[in-house]
Swiss-Prot record:
SUPFAM superfamilies: Ribosomal protein L10-like (SSF160369). It comes from the Bacteria. Keywords: Ribonucleoprotein, Ribosomal protein, RNA-binding, rRNA-binding. Belongs to the universal ribosomal protein uL10 family. GO terms for biological process: translation. Forms part of the ribosomal stalk, playing a central role in the interaction of the ribosome with GTP-bound translation factors. Pfam families: Ribosomal_L10. The keyword Transcription regulation does not apply. This is Large ribosomal subunit protein uL10. Gene3D superfamilies: 3.30.70.1730, 6.10.250.2350.
């Protein structure tokens, strides 16, 4: 059933609003996936906070116009599913990569971060990015390490003194 002009405008506005706020995007070819597999992909996308949409390529090109994902226009050929990450730049890449492991029919065409397009071979780089919580945890451990070493160093001085006094005491007891 063909879409009327108002429906097309609504789709373009919806995808454009998401693209304007997104941190990264993945374009994939879903040709060969069954309806149940697409439903599974959509449910996993909802669980991970990824916006996933199958859009006609001409509408997708209008939707990403004037966003940092306009660079993906060349990849919008054939059956295309768009996946946008809002909070975690690697979420969409992880979702598509993990789903593609089990379903060979899903093929990554391109991905974009910060207005730069990357090829399908670079999905591992984006997928391996830590989540926000993991990055904060790593930062906190890096910041905490010098303080912890300093505290251990400070504790070593009285500990060494106590061990020295105990050694002198043992030496005097054995001499007596």
């Amino acid at each position: 059933m063909p879409l009327n002009l108002e429906d097309k405008r609504a789709i373009v506005a919806s995808v454009n609003a998401v693209a304007a706020e997104a941190l990264s995007a993945v374009v994939a070819d879903y040709r060969g996936l069954t309806v149940s597999q697409m439903t599974e992909l959509r449910s996993k996308a909802r669980e991970t906070g990824v916006y996933l949409k199958v859009v006609r390529n001409t509408l997708a090109k209008f939707a990403v116009k004037d966003t940092e994902f306009e660079c993906l226009n060349d990849a919008l050929v054939g059956p295309t599913v768009l996946a946008f990450s809002k909070d975690d730049p690697g979420a969409a890449a992880r979702l598509i990569k993990d789903f593609a492991k089990d379903h060979d029919a899903l093929e990554v065409k391109a991905l974009a971060v910060g207005g730069v397009t990357y090829g399908a071979q670079d999905i591992d780089v984006l997928a391996k990015l830590p989540t926000r919580d993991e990055a904060i945890s790593q930062l906190m451990s890096v910041m905490q390490a010098p303080v912890a070493k300093f505290v251990r160093t400070l504790n070593e001085v009285p500990g060494k003194f106590v061990r020295t006094v105990a050694a002198v005491k043992d030496q005097k007891q054995s001499a007596a």
